[in-house]
């Protein structure tokens, strides 16, 4: 049996049409019981790595999801966290769900979340 170099094989493949190459790949997969789509699994794993990097982010948005029963305490907490005036803080609380802080450091976001939850609000970090 004649042995072909990679260059010779590439030259032969270069002369084939896409239909001929597709048929060749199918025949190759059947003969050697393999799948040409295997590298796709490696590509699918890449987003998982991206998700892990996303979990390690250092900036968070503090979202006021719901006010709860203690609206006045929540307004006071929003004023303390954001240094907003009374009217602005009330408008923010009345417009929930809204961002109280955006792109805050993790420790600041956790502190704000804790203060708002103590006041009776429902808060999430994004």
Swiss-Prot record:
Keywords: Ribonucleoprotein, Ribosomal protein. GO terms for biological process: translation. The keyword Ribosomal protein applies. InterPro entries: Ribosomal_bL12, Ribosomal_bL12_C, Ribosomal_bL12_C/ClpS-like, Ribosomal_bL12_oligo, Ribosomal_bL12_oligo_N_sf. CDD domains: Ribosomal_L7_L12. Residues 107-126 are annotated as: Disordered. One of its GO terms (cellular component) is cytosolic large ribosomal subunit. NCBIfam families: L12. Homodimer. Part of the ribosomal stalk of the 50S ribosomal subunit. Forms a multimeric L10(L12)X complex, where L10 forms an elongated spine to which 2 to 4 L12 dimers bind in a sequential fashion. Binds GTP-bound translation factors. Belongs to the bacterial ribosomal protein bL12 family. This is Large ribosomal subunit protein bL12. It comes from Bifidobacterium adolescentis (strain ATCC 15703 / DSM 20083 / NCTC 11814 / E194a).
